[in-house]
């Protein structure tokens, strides 16, 4: 097994063509995960880019967020575009690979999270915070239990910087930690979806980062042995799924660039946050959430912490800071939409590169 090309053992629709390489040599490239990842990326982009405008008239209209700066800019635009690009993602995965039982479950759960968000986007009255939080918690609990039992078989090992050997994690601790990671990832990503292109661009960076890590590092035996990290047997398949969703998301971000013509809605943001959380759990290092989504967590997650402390413990923190943080930057620091987007992306890029070295080299 080489560093770049992986044998595509469980072939499916496109890879059937690879057997025709005796007649046309280039067909053998369809046995490579690298090629299939490229196909997933480009197919996801062009299909979403082409289909999305024709779906505008069928999508619900944004109601505008109460008390949010510039809410009038979003009001009336088609929203819930997540139903399009998440569905494209699921179809692409089934086209390019034969998902295992766990992969199929994750695809189903991702689509289910998207569906709950889409129903909220379509509702005449916005669902309450407790209702949405309870649904997110339910999906997090279900996913944590399924991964712990069917994927890790109740034998979970996490790897950390400064430790050369993986650390055994009890099933209860894995379950509790996974629920927190998934719930935070879903809601922090949802809170970040308030500036044209911001949430989509940051999640896109996270997906490409995770896909690259799964393919070149965790999913490669030699690289994993060298870095003293556990080898993920199906790492290339998780990488393909990451690139498929990244491609579909690119098609949406193209249309969501300022001034946007469509919004992803809860249908998109919640599903994206959920899938990022799943990738982090599969990787075996919860700190990868900081590496790939650190800006998302600070931008949206800190606001969630502020609300929880105030509402349930009557503890007030950061009272002079508006959350999500991008609202504070626009209202108090007078950043433009383009400045918020570019500066947040730069910060995330710096964070990703810095933590990549810390997590994988300081062993």
Curated annotation (Swiss-Prot):
InterPro entries: Glycosyl_transferase_4, PNAcMuramoyl-5peptid_Trfase, PNAcMuramoyl-5peptid_Trfase_CS. Pathway: Cell wall biogenesis; peptidoglycan biosynthesis. PROSITE patterns: MRAY_1, MRAY_2. GO terms for biological process: cell division; cell wall organization; peptidoglycan biosynthetic process; regulation of cell shape. It is found in: Cell inner membrane. It catalyses: UDP-N-acetyl-alpha-D-muramoyl-L-alanyl-gamma-D-glutamyl-meso-2,6-diaminopimeloyl-D-alanyl-D-alanine + di-trans,octa-cis-undecaprenyl phosphate = di-trans,octa-cis-undecaprenyl diphospho-N-acetyl-alpha-D-muramoyl-L-alanyl-D-glutamyl-meso-2,6-diaminopimeloyl-D-alanyl-D-alanine + UMP. Catalyzes the initial step of the lipid cycle reactions in the biosynthesis of the cell wall peptidoglycan: transfers peptidoglycan precursor phospho-MurNAc-pentapeptide from UDP-MurNAc-pentapeptide onto the lipid carrier undecaprenyl phosphate, yielding undecaprenyl-pyrophosphoryl-MurNAc-pentapeptide, known as lipid I. Belongs to the glycosyltransferase 4 family. MraY subfamily. Its EC number is 2.7.8.13. GO terms for molecular function: metal ion binding; phospho-N-acetylmuramoyl-pentapeptide-transferase activity; UDP-N-acetylmuramoyl-L-alanyl-D-glutamyl-meso-2,6-diaminopimelyl-D-alanyl-D-alanine:undecaprenyl-phosphate transferase activity. The chain crosses the membrane at residues 33-53, 82-102, 105-125, 133-153, 166-186, 198-218, 227-247, 271-291, 295-315, 340-360. Its cofactor is Mg(2+). It comes from Treponema pallidum (strain Nichols). It is a multi-pass membrane protein. Pfam families: Glycos_transf_4. This is Phospho-N-acetylmuramoyl-pentapeptide-transferase.
